[in-house]
């Protein structure tokens, strides 16, 4: 079967296909792609570098994990030349299917690719045009993201042949996002094993670090949940909520309803399942859109930036999915994103999904207990490196697996199990990680890949050579600060040693990974000007010009280009150890930079390359080891002389980014204070830290404590501030679980909370000058000011605030009372605009005691008109002493019982009468900032002007009346002994008819507002029945005034028009 066909025309499939386009954070000019994550705006102080934790928003519990994640992002796993062919586009259609010779660098899970043919076309450094073209080509690599990729190896059983008639061997099939699929073919078995091991290791470390991040995330954020004890208990409950799901990376998100069902059996092989429905109406299993029946891994996805940790809710499930009930399960990567809820933190949402999901598939020790041991392969923290170690394994550790014939048929899960077996055996011998370094420039470097990662050697997470030319770097006397580059002239003895050297590694054709002398040969430091590296023993390092180093500084770059494999000194090279390279020293004890200056301009050879005859010879598509040796082509790419010109601005690292140089190189200066001894001096948790004298109380939190203890053993004490360290080393007994009475614990889900709070605050500010308390309320009963008033507070304020009728608070003319609320016994004290007259027991109308006359100068007033009213009737004046208003302190009511209401009906004592629901109406709703606004009440006229008094209710046509004082507690004289009953709104029909200005002298008082005779039609509608009230007996006639408000009061001489 042939899958590769087409004409001989070269098609740039990598550049033309959108699936291989560079991500948005890559590309651009060569120098502008270097992104430095400056987390502080402070000026750099060499004597006291700023701690990363002082400017980083990340909690200290997550810093060790984020350090390892970013170290993995910038790790250079492997590099070399191979052939690539894109088989399918992102939509599943056939691509160009043309082989292309590329030079690739695997950085983390990003595979950067350059067209090897284009790189070889511009080998003349003396030509300015070539330099410009080479810069453009080198600055725009193509990236393939392998984070969620699926790998499969091809062998003879696949029966895939090329156009030359030979089987496709030493090839990998890579399926990435959407439906993109690529074929990667390597020159020989050794190269294939090296690349296969590197890609498998990078995927294993990526998933393992994501699981460790999940453990650290639950440990640091889970303690903030108030019911974390209940959530971690071993109890089975179903989880139901709306989520967004996508099946595979790059697929569209679909909103569905997720139901996590727990297993009813405790056996090992019985799991629950996650059912996904299109809606929350039909949640039966036969209506499920998809069902996750098994999960091998489940973890929270790190959002690539520390600032997004608390807002990201993406979860990845690696398992088996059924889309139909009768079909077999398919292995899929499912991404689930629980929907966020208002006023609920994102970490709360994701943790409440993670724990039940782990329980249903019995992952990581759940539902019994989260495993925190780094020796247990089922733990979230299995094999986690201990800082300063930053990697799980070396690529060479996986070579025995790739050399095995059986590994050709392993699935991704089987590869993970075999890699875990290797790591477990090493951990049993005291293994703590690899690639130790004390030159970690920052625990939180930039997640972006730039020119420093692509073309420059990084001893640690990022190369310290980025600080060349920085004043702060040159002035720092720390051993990690490298001096400025200077041209080094070799002595004659050194030249003789190099001429006489005959390194056996030059003749070696195997890749550098199989050499057991140094596990770090892939990462041998090179000069900043020559960033594409070839190591000792590499097939790419065949010596073309065994000419000794040039001794003159005036030699041209082409004369100074030498072979990379020639040692610095053949006698001292044998004593060089990886540890000395890690410490920044060579075998002779000198700085690496001094030795690297001798070999900074070397030629890069690309062996087994075929791009010179790419368009003529089809057979060159086959790179079988037998035929490829006969047609092997070696093309030199003298990149070193070109890149040397870009080591300075604007494309090099001596020119800072926008802003001060101190900000640009801040994270590199921090490396001077992070020594290896500081990393090992971290204090970890002990069981006594969490006991606090009560072990049973914190038994459930032991899972989080164990995770925190393991994470804090990573040794990052030097990057934490004192306050953060104290907080980490404290016990969980001091963790706030949401029981404090602070603002964060308020019930934000109360729909009336915000409205009440705003109303109270606005009305208090509005009436702070008008409300003079008549009786001081004790501090214990003062209002909380948060929109919530205790019951006792309401009662005492209602009684004491209006106890006396003889004192009236001073009222400012520009802020008068609200007439609509006068006489409303259900208005809450905290929400009324005016508290001068309310229907408390002191505000009831007072009648003389039976048998006793009323003094001639005393009048009973029930309504106080605001001052400055343009009215000819002087009896409504604010200071009219003849009225006997409450402003006259000498006016007193005669002793005796109070009148029991507007109709003076006798009523049995101690009987509470609740008004009919339709007898009341809602209070006037005031929007903040406008005390006279009508709010959202329909068809309601605006509030009265402060200097306008409404007409009596009875004279307002077809207007509903407000509640009156008939439903008083008859056991106490005049009204309620405590708080008023709750307000009950009713359906009220408002009108907008014009109102008459003021009551006529024959109209009844507006104070009493009795209901009309409901037995008679009122504007076309019949009202309620009102029983007649008994008349007063033995009451003496009061002196009749010719005018005044008292003429409308019932007496012996004046009949009450509403008594019948």
UniProtKB/Swiss-Prot annotation:
> Which Gene Ontology terms of cellular component type are present?
cellular bud neck; cytoplasm; nucleus
Record's keyword annotation contains Phosphoprotein: yes
Question: What's in the keyword line of the UniProt record?
Answer: Activator, Cytoplasm, Nucleus, Phosphoprotein, Repressor, Transcription, Transcription regulation
Question: Which Gene Ontology terms describe the biological processes this protein takes part in?
Answer: signal transduction
Pfam families this protein is in?
Answer: PH, PH_26
Entry's localization field: Cytoplasm; Nucleus; Bud neck
Q: Where is the composition biased (Basic and acidic residues)?
A: 571-589, 801-814
Where in the numbering of this chain does the PH domain appear? 75-204
Residue positions where Phosphoserine is found in the record: 491, 510, 518, 538, 556, 871, 885
Q: Share any extra remarks.
A: Present with 1380 molecules/cell in log phase SD medium.
Query: Subunit arrangement?
Result: Subunit of the 1.0 MDa CCR4-NOT core complex that contains CCR4, CAF1, CAF120, NOT1, NOT2, NOT3, NOT4, NOT5, CAF40 and CAF130. In the complex interacts with NOT1. The core complex probably is part of a less characterized 1.9 MDa CCR4-NOT complex.
- Please give the family membership noted in the entry: Belongs to the CAF120 family.
**What does the protein in this record do?**
Acts as a component of the CCR4-NOT core complex, which in the nucleus seems to be a general transcription factor, and in the cytoplasm the major mRNA deadenylase involved in mRNA turnover. The NOT protein subcomplex negatively regulates the basal and activated transcription of many genes. Preferentially affects TC-type TATA element-dependent transcription. Could directly or indirectly inhibit component(s) of the general transcription machinery.
What's the protein name? Answer: CCR4-NOT transcriptional complex subunit CAF120
Q: Which gene encodes it?
A: CAF120
């Amino acid at each position: 079967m042939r899958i590769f066909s087409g004409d001989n025309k070269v098609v740039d499939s990598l550049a033309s296909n959108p699936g291989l386009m560079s991500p948005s954070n890559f590309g651009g000019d060569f120098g502008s792609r270097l992104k430095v994550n400056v987390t502080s705006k402070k000026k750099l102080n060499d004597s006291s570098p700023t701690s990363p934790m002082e400017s980083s928003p990340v909690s200290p519990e997550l810093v060790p994990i984020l350090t390892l994640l970013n170290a993995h992002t910038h790790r250079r796993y492997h590099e070399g030349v191979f052939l690539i062919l894109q088989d399918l586009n992102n939509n599943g259609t056939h691509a160009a299917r043309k082989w292309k010779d590329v030079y690739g660098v695997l950085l983390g899970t990003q595979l950067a690719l350059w067209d090897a043919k284009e790189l070889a076309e511009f080998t003349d450094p003396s030509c300015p045009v070539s330099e410009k073209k080479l810069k453009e080509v080198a600055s725009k690599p193509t990236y393939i993201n392998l984070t969620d990729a699926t790998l499969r190896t091809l062998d003879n059983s696949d029966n895939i042949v090329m156009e030359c008639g030979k089987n496709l061997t030493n090839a990998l099939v890579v399926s990435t996002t959407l439906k993109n699929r690529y074929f990667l073919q390597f020159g020989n078995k050794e190269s294939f094993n090296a690349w296969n091991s590197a890609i498998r290791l990078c995927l294993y470390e990526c998933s393992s670090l994501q699981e460790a991040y999940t453990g650290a995330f639950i440990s640091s954020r889970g303690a903030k949940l108030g019911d974390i004890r209940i959530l971690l208990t071993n109890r089975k409950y179903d989880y139901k909520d709306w989520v967004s799901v996508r099946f595979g990376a790059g697929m569209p998100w679909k909103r569905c309803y997720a139901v996590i069902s727990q297993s009813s059996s405790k056996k090992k092989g019985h799991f629950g399942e996650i059912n996904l429905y299109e809606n929350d109406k039909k949640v039966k299993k036969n209506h499920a859109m998809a069902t996750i029946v098994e999960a091998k891994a489940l973890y929270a996805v790190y959002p690539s930036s520390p600032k997004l940790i608390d807002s990201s809710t993406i979860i990845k499930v690696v398992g088996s999915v059924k889309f139909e009930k009768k079909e077999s399960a398919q292995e899929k990567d499912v991404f689930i994103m629980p929907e966020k809820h208002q006023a609920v933190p994102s970490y709360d949402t994701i943790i409440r999904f993670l724990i039940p999901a782990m329980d249903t598939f019995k992952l990581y020790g759940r539902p019994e207990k989260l495993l925190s041991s780094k020796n247990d392969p089922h733990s979230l923290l299995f094999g986690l490196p201990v800082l300063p170690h930053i990697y799980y394994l070396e690529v060479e550790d996986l070579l025995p697996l790739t050399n095995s014939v059986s590994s050709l048929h392993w699935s991704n899960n089987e590869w993970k199990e075999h890699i875990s077996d290797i790591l477990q055996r090493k951990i049993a011998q005291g293994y703590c990680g690899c690639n130790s370094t004390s030159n970690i420039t920052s625990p939180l470097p930039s997640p972006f890949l730039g020119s420093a990662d692509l073309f420059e050697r990084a001893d640690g997470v990022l190369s310290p050579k980025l600080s060349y030319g920085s004043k702060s770097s040159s002035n720092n006397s720390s051993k990690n600060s490298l001096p400025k580059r200077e041209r080094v002239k070799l002595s004659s003895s050194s030249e003789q040693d190099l001429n006489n050297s005959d390194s056996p590694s030059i003749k070696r054709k195997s890749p550098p990974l199989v050499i057991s002398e140094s596990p770090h040969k892939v990462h041998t430091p090179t000069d900043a000007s020559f960033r594409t590296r070839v190591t000792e023993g590499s097939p790419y390092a065949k010596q073309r010009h065994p000419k000794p180093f040039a001794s003159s500084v005036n030699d041209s770059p082409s004369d100074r280009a030498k072979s990379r494999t020639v040692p610095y000194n053949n006698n001292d090279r044998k004593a060089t150890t990886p540890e000395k390279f890690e410490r920044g020293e060579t075998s002779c004890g000198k700085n690496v930079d001094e030795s690297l200056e001798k070999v900074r301009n070397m030629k890069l050879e690309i062996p087994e390359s075929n791009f010179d005859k790419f368009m003529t010879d089809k057979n060159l598509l086959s790179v079988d080891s037998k035929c490829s040796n006969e047609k092997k082509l070696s093309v030199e790419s003298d990149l070193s002389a070109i890149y040397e010109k870009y080591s300075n601005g604007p494309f090099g690292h001596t020119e800072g980014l926008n802003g001060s140089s101190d900000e640009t190189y801040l994270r590199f200066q921090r490396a001077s204070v992070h020594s290896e001894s500081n990393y090992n001096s971290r204090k970890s948790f002990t069981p006594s830290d969490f006991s606090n004298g009560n072990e049973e109380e914190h038994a459930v939190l032991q899972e989080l404590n164990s995770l925190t203890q393991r994470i804090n053993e990573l040794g990052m004490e030097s990057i934490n501030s004192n306050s953060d360290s104290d907080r980490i080393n404290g016990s969980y007994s001091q963790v706030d679980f949401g029981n404090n009475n602070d603002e964060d614990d308020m019930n934000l889900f109360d729909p009336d909370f915000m409205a009440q709070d705003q109303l109270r605050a606005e009305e208090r500010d509005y009436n702070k000058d008008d409300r003079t308390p008549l009786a001081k309320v004790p501090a214990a009963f003062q209002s909380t000011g948060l929109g919530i008033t205790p019951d006792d507070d309401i009662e005492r304020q209602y009684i004491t605030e209006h106890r006396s009728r003889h004192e009236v608070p001073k009222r400012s003319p520009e802020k008068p009372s609200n007439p609509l609320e006068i006489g409303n016994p259900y208005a809450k004290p905290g929400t009324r605009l005016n508290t001068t007259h309310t229907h408390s027991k002191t505000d009831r109308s007072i009648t003389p005691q039976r048998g006793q006359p009323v003094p001639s100068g005393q009048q009973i007033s029930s309504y106080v008109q605001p001052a400055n009213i343009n009215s000819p009737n002087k009896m409504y004046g604010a200071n009219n002493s003849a009225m006997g208003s409450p402003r006259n302190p000498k006016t007193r009511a005669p002793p005796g019982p109070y009148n029991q209401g507007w109709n003076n009906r006798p009523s049995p004592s101690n009987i509470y009468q609740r008004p009919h629901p339709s007898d009341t109406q809602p209070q006037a709703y005031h929007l903040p900032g406008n005390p006279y606004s009508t709010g959202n009440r329909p068809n309601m006229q605006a509030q009265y002007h402060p200097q306008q008094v409404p007409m009596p209710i009875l004279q307002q046509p077809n207007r509903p009346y407000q509640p009156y004082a008939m439903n008083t507690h008859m056991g106490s004289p005049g009204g309620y002994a405590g708080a008023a009953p709750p307000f009950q709104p009713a359906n009220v029909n408002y009108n907008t008819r014009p109102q008459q200005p003021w009551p006529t002298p024959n109209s009844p008082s507006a104070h009493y507002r009795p209901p009309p005779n409901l037995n008679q039609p009122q504007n076309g509608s019949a009202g309620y029945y009102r029983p007649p009230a008994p008349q007063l007996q033995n009451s003496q006639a009061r002196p009749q005034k010719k005018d005044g408000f008292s003429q409308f009061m019932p007496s012996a001489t004046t009949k009450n028009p509403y008594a019948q």
